[in-house]
């Protein structure tokens, strides 16, 4: 039997309340039913973030082709704007969507969604082909309409929908109480009680949870749930006030749940007005399932004092945990609780107080609760719920012999559109989008937008060109087609020529429509296009496609001192966008993958994330015709080579410091630097060109062709790679290809890529002394023999064809390196919820432990007269720090400074902060820039104290002191 279920209640505020929990477990039970069930669920694309979150949760027990989206047209709630034409159109679009899926039976899981949100539940109508049933929970708002339906539009909306319940072929009730409510209020309704259960996830956690509450002299009475009027929480302070003084003093009341603060304040005010101890009222926020179980187990009593409940899940869960429950004798609660000593009149604080006192005074209810627990476990199970539902639905289902013709379905819905005299504006598109995609061919779309747009030849674009070129030669991997794409505006993605030579002609092709069998791979650098791409990537996720982002490095986050000032915030925004839309990340090294994983942990990222990496290719085919053998005539002393763009991150100053000290102490060695002039390289270039050894033992080649590079590698005895941070390390791989030893800074990625070099020595990153020691050891050994031995064996590293195959192995064949899983088990987290990215309060002194170190040789004088240097900030605490705080500017963590004149007088303390870009995790080190503006130098600034500061809170102490007259290099301002 093919069953379709309206899943919009998993997108609205219901998703985190009783209805959402019920429907999710109901769907899981149906999907896992032993019956011949083919279950399908549809979500409303108008609530995009919520649809993606629900889609992710449903994948726990449904396949992608069982989860669908349709596009509603309503933008407001019915109780706010009425039953508008947009809602009528949405009903038509949803009807057409269901007809296209052709289930044997359709089920509306929650009929009262869309009061204050865009949800449009499916109701019976003339165009709908399959029989339609609904789940009926209760009619509490109607029973207490003076409380819940005060406005005429709210009452009209509720009554319109309640009256329509008589047109459903069957109502599935969740308790005997709700079944009787339906019979009483809905004339001619046909219903059955399918009951409810405790989630398997909850039971699994309970069975594995070893937590045992500690013996505590204080007792605890706990309420878990919402605070609206019918929950009757206001009776609890009144009952507490009637307890004996000893119990009042020895008992805490714990309020748990995601509560609006004004409602909590009302409870607190009532508590205080009754003279109850303020310290006895404790508030807990939204709790996870594991936390919930521990709350149940640690409580002496769980309260459920509602005026009316359609079921009583809190009471059921607490009793399954063996905890006494005191519940009102109203609604469906007596069906669950079943012990008279634990039931009370919800209008009597005195009776509630007596029940509390009876249990806290030592009433032995354990035998009764143990017996009831066994009984409840048998009665209320989701397996039984699924069996009951399947039996009830099978009675009214109509089996579809074959899928209907799509054209006939379009004609059918067109009749209803005409009869309803609907304006067709926007409706045609909504109806078209309502039709499920039928093409199940697997496709991998590779974004190359930036490379096509700019035609630059940066490192990233070299990767994009090589990967796209190799993909174009394959065209297909297994059953997956490989397609290069381009997107630069709101129209979406288009197929691009694999040569990447020009933009696609949008007038001769249609934009790509993504489906559940597709994967979108964001290979190119899309930092400047993140906002443009985000909308289309969300649409791809809505339709079930995978979105994989490529991460080259985290340099702008971890070492902003080595970037243009505008780059870190742009990169941060891109990464946030990528984290919102991606189902996975592929990194260009294992080291970067590990850094990403640690970042997700540090911000408590609340979603699952696949993380993989692949090795970039090293293409030596263009060197085949060149002489790659070692030169026969070698220098009488060691020759060292650096290859890479001139920029502060590459560590050229460290290398020059080491050689300066070495040359001064008798080290006889040459240093050749190969690299074009890069960002922030003015001081480095000036230092090289004015160096006394320049042209003698120090050489700089800013541009070389392939043949010259080969000659330089062959003439060298070792490569030096001194970077502070990298995403890869191509020169190390190249050195391995030419068989020369490597001396590298000890960073994880260099450890990783040194597999591509036969012999690598490491020195302490950023330490010229450590580098000099390593150079001396190299020179003191038989360096000629060592270099010769290294050249004999050339380690294997993938070429670009093999690299492309590795990449496909990760994305298509799903050979992921690791999967990040959040610690919290909260469901339905919005994709835009990225965890913790800011401080909302001051960091406690215990969380402020840190170390500051000025990077040697980093002091520079800018051309405009300002001064700049780099500070290494190490988090020595157990708490993650964030550069962002509240919107009013408070609580972000940054480097600040105080300036003093030559006499030690304070000149200035309110200065430009150098912020942590995103998050600085415990044990990690970030390199932050500090800039002193020219005007303060002109006013006599002679020294500086650099210190961590949390804005609006405190300076953290242990400042670094630095004299501004120290050696410096002149840097031009771009």
At which residue positions do the language-model features occur?
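Carbohydrate transferase catalytic cores enriched for Leloir-type hexosyltransferases
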Residues: 1-833
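Low-complexity, acidic Ser/Thr/Pro/Gly-rich terminal tails and inter-domain linkers that flank the onset
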Residues: 828-862, 876
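Short beta-strand elements of extracellular/lumenal beta-sandwich folds
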Residues: 864-880
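Short, acidic/polar linear motifs in exposed loop/turn regions
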Residues: 874-879, 885, 936, 952
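Short coil-to-beta strand junction motifs in C2/discoidin
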Residues: 884-894
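Short beta-strand and strand-turn-strand segments in soluble, beta-rich domains
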Residues: 892-894, 898-916
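Intrinsically disordered, low-complexity Pro/Gly/Ser/Thr-rich segments with frequent PxxP/GP/PP motifs
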Residues: 907-937
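Terminal connector regions
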Residues: 936-971
């Amino acid at each position: 039997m093919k069953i379709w279920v309206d899943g919009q209640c998993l997108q609205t505020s219901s998703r985190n309340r009783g209805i959402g929990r019920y429907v999710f477990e109901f769907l899981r039970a149906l999907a896992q039913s032993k019956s011949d069930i083919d279950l399908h669920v549809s979500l409303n694309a108008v609530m995009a973030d919520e649809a993606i979150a629900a889609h992710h949760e449903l994948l726990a027990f449904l396949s992608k082709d069982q989860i669908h989206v349709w596009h509603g047209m309503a933008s407001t709630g019915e109780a706010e704007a009425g039953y508008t034409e947009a809602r009528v159109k949405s009903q038509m679009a949803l009807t057409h969507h269901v007809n296209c899926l052709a289930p044997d039976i359709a089920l509306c899981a929650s009929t009262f969604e869309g009061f204050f949100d865009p949800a449009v539940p499916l109701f019976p109508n003339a165009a709908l082909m399959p029989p339609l049933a609904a789940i009926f929970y209760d009619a509490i708002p109607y029973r207490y309409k003076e409380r819940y339906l005060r406005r005429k539009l709210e009452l009209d909306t509720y009554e319109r929908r309640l009256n329509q319940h008589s047109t459903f072929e069957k109502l599935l009730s969740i308790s005997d109480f709700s079944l009787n409510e339906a019979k009483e209020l809905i004339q001619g309704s046909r219903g059955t009680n399918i009951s409810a259960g405790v989630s398997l996830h909850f039971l699994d956690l309970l069975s594995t949870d070893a937590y045992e509450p500690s013996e505590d002299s204080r007792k605890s009475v706990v309420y878990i749930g919402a605070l609206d009027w019918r929950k009757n929480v206001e009776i609890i302070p009144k009952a507490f006030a009637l307890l004996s003084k000893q119990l009042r003093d020895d008992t805490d009341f714990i309020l748990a749940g995601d509560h609006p603060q004004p409602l909590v304040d009302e409870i607190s005010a009532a508590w205080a007005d009754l003279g109850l101890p303020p310290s006895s009222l404790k508030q807990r926020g939204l709790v996870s399932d594991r936390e919930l179980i521990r709350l149940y187990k640690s409580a002496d009593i769980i309260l459920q004092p509602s005026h009316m409940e359609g079921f009583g899940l809190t009471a059921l869960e607490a009793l399954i945990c063996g905890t006494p429950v005191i519940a009102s004798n109203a609604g469906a609660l007596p069906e669950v609780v079943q012990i008279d000593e634990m039931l009370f009149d919800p209008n009597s604080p005195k009776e509630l107080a007596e029940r509390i006192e009876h249990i806290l005074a030592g009433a032995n209810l354990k035998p009764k609760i143990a017996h009831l627990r066994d009984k409840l476990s048998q009665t209320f199970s989701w397996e039984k719920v699924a069996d009951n539902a399947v039996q009830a639905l099978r009675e009214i289902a109509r089996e579809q012999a074959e899928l209907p013709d799509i054209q006939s379905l379009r004609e059918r819905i067109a009749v209803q559109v005409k009869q309803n005299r609907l304006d067709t504006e926007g409706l045609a598109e909504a109806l078209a989008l309502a039709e499920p995609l039928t093409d199940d061919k697997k496709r991998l779309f590779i974004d190359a937008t930036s490379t096509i747009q700019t035609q630059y030849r940066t490192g990233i674009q070299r990767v994009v060109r090589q990967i796209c070129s190799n993909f174009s030669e394959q065209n297909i991997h297994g059953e997956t087609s490989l397609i290069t794409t381009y997107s630069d505006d709101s129209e979406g993605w288009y197929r691009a020529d694999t040569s990447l030579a020009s933009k696609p002609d949008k007038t001769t092709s249609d934009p790509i429509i993504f489906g559940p069998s597709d994967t979108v791979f964001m290979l190119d650098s899309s930092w400047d296009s993140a906002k443009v791409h985000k909308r289309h990537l969300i649409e791809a996720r809505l339709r079930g496609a995978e979105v994989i982002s490529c991460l080259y490095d985290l340099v702008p986050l971890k070492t902003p001192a080595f970037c243009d000032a505008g780059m870190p915030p742009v990169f941060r925004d891109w990464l946030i966008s990528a984290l919102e839309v991606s189902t996975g990340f592929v990194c260009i090294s294992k080291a970067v993958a590990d850094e990403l994983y640690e970042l997700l942990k540090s911000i408590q990222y609340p979603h699952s994330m696949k993380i993989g990496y692949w090795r970039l290719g090293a293409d030596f085919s263009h060197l085949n015709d060149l002489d790659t053998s070692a030169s026969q005539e070698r220098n009488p002393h060691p020759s060292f080579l650096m290859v890479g763009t001139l920029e502060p991150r590459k560590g050229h100053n460290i290398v020059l410091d080491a050689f300066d000290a070495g040359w001064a102490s008798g080290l006889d060695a040459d240093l050749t630097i190969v690299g074009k002039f890069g960002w922030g390289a003015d001081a480095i270039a000036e230092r090289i060109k004015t160096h006394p050894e320049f042209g003698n033992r120090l050489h700089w080649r800013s541009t070389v062709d392939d043949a010259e590079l080969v000659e330089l590698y062959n003439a060298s005895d070792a490569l030096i790679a001194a970077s502070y941070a990298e995403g890869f390390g191509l020169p190390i791989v190249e050195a391995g290809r030419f068989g020369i030893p490597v001396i590298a800074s000890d960073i994880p990625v260099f450890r990783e890529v040194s597999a591509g070099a036969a012999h690598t020595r490491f020195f302490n990153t950023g330490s010229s002394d450590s580098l000099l020691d390593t150079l001396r050891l190299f020179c003191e050994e038989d360096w000629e023999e060592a270099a010769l031995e290294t050249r004999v064996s050339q380690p294997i590293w993938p070429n670009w064809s093999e690299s492309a195959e590795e990449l496909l192995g990760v994305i298509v064949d799903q050979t992921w390196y690791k999967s990040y899983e959040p610690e919290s088990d909260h469901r339905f987290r919005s994709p835009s919820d990225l965890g913790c990215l800011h401080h909302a309060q001051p960091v406690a002194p215990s969380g402020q432990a840190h170390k500051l170190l000025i990077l040697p040789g980093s002091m520079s004088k800018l051309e405009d007269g300002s001064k700049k240097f780099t500070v290494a900030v190490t988090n020595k605490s157990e708490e993650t720090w964030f550069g962002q705080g509240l919107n009013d500017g408070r609580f972000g963590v940054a480097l600040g400074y105080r300036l003093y004149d030559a006499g030690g007088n304070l000149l200035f303390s309110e200065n430009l902060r150098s912020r942590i870009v995103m998050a600085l995790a415990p044990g990690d080190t970030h390199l932050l820039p500090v800039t002193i503006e020219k005007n303060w130098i002109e006013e006599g600034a002679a020294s500086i104290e650099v210190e961590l500061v949390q804005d609006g809170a405190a300076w953290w102490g242990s400042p670094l002191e630095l004299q501004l007259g120290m050696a410096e290099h002149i840097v031009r301002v771009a």
